[in-house]
Amino acid sequence: MVLDGDRVLVMKRHKRGRDYAVLPGGGVEPGETTAEAALRELHEETTLVAEIDRMLWTGRHNDRPATYFLMTAVRGQARLSGPEAAANRPDNSFELRWATADQFAELGLHPADIRGRLAQLLARSG
């Protein structure tokens, strides 16, 4: 998770006629730790480089285990990149944006069960 005061970086999606948002992230490759995967995915999807401050919590996303990390020492400017940029088209769009807690429901932040914990985290850091 990349925070900026009371905002978190999300990827707004439009796919198969559905609008929603997710946190940048993805799968763990063979031989990779979850922390290494989080840093790699962040860079691949956003061009940002960061360090991990700490693991925040674990859960499930799309029926797969998910580990959520708080990023620190974030460098660069968030720009869509990697497979998401290559696949970006009107019927399958990707857009990086900063979101406040009061925008989570409107954006359809997924998975929905992280909204409350993330809102608390933003309230403490904002």
Language-model-detected regions and their locations in the chain:
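N-terminal strand-loop-strand
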Residues: 1-23, 50-54
